[in-house]
C-alpha cells in the first residue's frame, strides 16, 4: 500500500532530440513509494522517452527529476541503475554475456559486492526465475519469452527500489504473462514502486490501479485506471480501444438491459448478470403462478 512519499517527482520537464523532434512537453508528475502505475498512449507519445529520464539514459532539456528527494541531474546512469531498473521492450538489446549466469553476475558489478555475496544473489535469482538448468546456456539460444525473463532476472538481482517495464506482455504467451503478474504481486508486497508502459488495455484495467495517459508528448490524464480507460474521449484521442467490459456493457444497453456504467470489472459484471437473471427468473415464475 502506498505511503504519501513522492519517490519520483518530475517538475516541468521537456526533452527535444538533437534532430529537433520534441518528445516531452511540460511533464509534471509524482509517483509515490509502493505505487503501481501504468503509462499508456499511442506510439510516439513520449512514453519510452519519459521512463528513460528516470534512470538518466536521457537527460531532460529543461526541468528537473527527483528520485527519493534528490535531483538526479548530476547522478550517473550506473548510480541511478542501483535505484531504478528498466526492462525494455526488446530485452535482447540488454544481453551482453556468454552465459545466463555471467549475464546476471554482470548486472551486479555496480554494487561492489564480494564474490560470495554476488554468487548467493545469482543462485537465488536463477532459482526464483526457474533458470537454474540454463545457467551455462548462451542467452542467444533463448526464446523471446526466456530472454525477457533473463532481462527481468538481471534487474531483480540488483534489487532496485523502482522497477520499470516497457510492454512486458507484448509477445508473451498466457503462461509467461501469468508469471509476470505473480512477479508484480510479490514485488508489491515488498513495497516496490512499479511503472508499466503498456498498450494492453485489458491488462491495465485488471491489474493497474493508476494510469498516466500520454498524447503528443504530454500527459493528458492521470488518475484511477477504471475512470481514464472508460472515458471514450480520452481513449479515442490516444488511439486505444475501449475495454471489452465497456463494449459488452453497451451491447447490454442496446438490448434493453440497463447495466450500471460504473461496472468496470469482469467480477462485478458477472455478479450483476447473475442478479439480473435471478430477478428475471423470479418475475417469470411469479407471473405464471
PLM region spans:
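ABC ATPase C-loop
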Residues: 155-156
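Conserved ABC ATPase "signature" C-loop
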Residues: 216-217
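Conserved ABC ATPase signature
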Residues: 138-142, 146
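Catalytic Walker B motif of ABC-type/P-loop ATPase nucleotide-binding domains
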Residues: 163-166
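Conserved ABC transporter NBD signature motif
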Residues: 63-71, 80
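Helix-to-loop junction immediately C-terminal to a conserved catalytic motif
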Residues: 55
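The feature captures the beta-strand-to-loop junction immediately N-terminal to the Walker
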Residues: 40-42
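Conserved ABC ATPase "signature" region
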Residues: 116-134
Amino acid at each position: 500500500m502506498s505511503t504519501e512519499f513522492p519517490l519520483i517527482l518530475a517538475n516541468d520537464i521537456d526533452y527535444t532530440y538533437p534532430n529537433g523532434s520534441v518528445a516531452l512537453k511540460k511533464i509534471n508528475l509524482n509517483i509515490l513509494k509502493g505505487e503501481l502505475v501504468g503509462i499508456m498512449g499511442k506510439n510516439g507519445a513520449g512514453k519510452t522517452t519519459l521512463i528513460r529520464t528516470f534512470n538518466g539514459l536521457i537527460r531532460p532539456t529543461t526541468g528537473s527529476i527527483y528520485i527519493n528527494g534528490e535531483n538526479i541531474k548530476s547522478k550517473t546512469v550506473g548510480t541511478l541503475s542501483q535505484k531504478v531498473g528498466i526492462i525494455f521492450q526488446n530485452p535482447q538489446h540488454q544481453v551482453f554475456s556468454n552465459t545466463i549466469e555471467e549475464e546476471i553476475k554482470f548486472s551486479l558489478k555496480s554494487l561492489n559486492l564480494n564474490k560470495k555475496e554476488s554468487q548467493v544473489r545469482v543462485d537465488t535469482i536463477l532459482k526464483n526465475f526457474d533458470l537454474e538448468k540454463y545457467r551455462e546456456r548462451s542467452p542467444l539460444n533463448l526464446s523471446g519469452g526466456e530472454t525477457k525473463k533473463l532481462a527481468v532476472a538481471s534487474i531483480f538481482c540488483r534489487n532496485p527500489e523502482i522497477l520499470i517495464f516497457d510492454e512486458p506482455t507484448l509477445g508473451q504467451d498466457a503462461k509467461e504473462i501469468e508469471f509476470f503478474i505473480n512477479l508484480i504481486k510479490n514485488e508489491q508486497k515488498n513495497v516496490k514502486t512499479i511503472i508499466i508502459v503498456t498498450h494492453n488495455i485489458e491488462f491495465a484495467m485488471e491489474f493497474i490501479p493508476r494510469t498516466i495517459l500520454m498524447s503528443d508528448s504530454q500527459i493528458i490524464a492521470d488518475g484511477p485506471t477504471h475512470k481514464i480507460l472508460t472515458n471514450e474521449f480520452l481513449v479515442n484521442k490516444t488511439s486505444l480501444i475501449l475495454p471489452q467490459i465497456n463494449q459488452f456493457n453497451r451491447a447490454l444497453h442496446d438490448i434493453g438491459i440497463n447495466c450500471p456504467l460504473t461496472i468496470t470489472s469482469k467480477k462485478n459484471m458477472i455478479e450483476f448478470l447473475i442478479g439480473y437473471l435471478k430477478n428475471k427468473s423470479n418475475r417469470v415464475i411469479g407471473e405464471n403462478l
